[in-house]
Amino acid sequence: MSGSKWFDKSLLLRDGVSLISRIWLPNSNGPWPALLMRQPYGREIASTITYSHPEWWVSKGYMVVIQDVRGMGASEGVFNGFKQEARDTSETHEWVRSLKECNGKLGLYGFSYQGFTQLTGELNSKPPDCLSPAMTGMNLSLIHI
């Protein structure tokens, strides 16, 4: 597949930690709706046989953002499992929506840990417009976020 461009971009969180995202854009005039995956396995997981390659989504008119969560991949900080995800997820949603390439619409996708990150966010934050979690077997009421 071709017809898209990608680049890495850093989000500086309020606590000073930097999260790294890889962003794919269509070769057409934006802004576009964004699809976001936040994950701990390295940004390259988004372009394996596990998921449709970001270029496929780009060919459908979406910008795609794949982010390494705190302390994993190229992102800074310490990975503490699920404890930091509500705050980091909310700040990431706000950041993606503020990017000049994004039209303000935000969808989330992924399974397992990537599914979990879709279900977190601070109570006072704006929710995503669409989400698609899968294989996320957890009881969120048992997690103290």
Predicted regions and their residues:
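N-terminal cap/lid segment of alpha/beta-hydrolase-fold proteins
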Residues: 1-28
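Alpha/beta-hydrolase fold nucleophile elbow
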Residues: 101-112
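Short glycine-enriched nucleophile-adjacent loop
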Residues: 115-126
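Conserved small/polar residues in nucleotide/adenosyl-binding loops
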Residues: 143-145
